[in-house]
Amino acid sequence: VVIGVDHGVPIPVLRAFDGRGPITLVHIDAHIDWRDEVNGVHEGYSSPIRRASELSHIDRIFQIGMRGQGSARAKEVEDALNYGAEIITAYEVHEKGIDSVLDRIPANENYYLTIDADGLDPTVMPAVAAPVAGGLLFYQVRGLIHSLAQKGRLLGMDIVEITPERDLNGISSLTAGQLILNFIGATARAGYFS
């Protein structure tokens, strides 16, 4: 489990999994994060999924919770789709349920889960720089974690982009902590540590 500041954090973490592939990357976020660079920075908060797509051991990418207006330029969306990334909006999750998303993710694979806090709804994760209404709910992300741990091997998880000074009543810290505990519990129940 990695807890980080900006969404550039998963880039070196994913590189460290070289040799453990193929890996299916599951990305929860309001934004697609396929920018090549922002102000000359190629490995920052808007680029982790593009960088992941360049790693030979990352086999598939599922992007869940997308809904941020203006978060991607046409070229970035085109690049993501050309790579084969499956972009699943938060609205689709709400309308069809998290199980319909899980049905699209192949079983018996290695998974890495990267969570940008703004992928969750601001009612459960308010302490973010770019809040967008309509995000995933705690129970949906919890269900995703438990299902991935059961259907394959959940190699790791990160949660990033929490802005502590915006954390109303500690709600975001509590939600992040509960997700981390669910990751640990789900992997233990799946027999990872026996």
Predicted regions and their residues:
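Conserved alpha-helical scaffold segments that buttress catalytic/binding sites
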Residues: 1-194
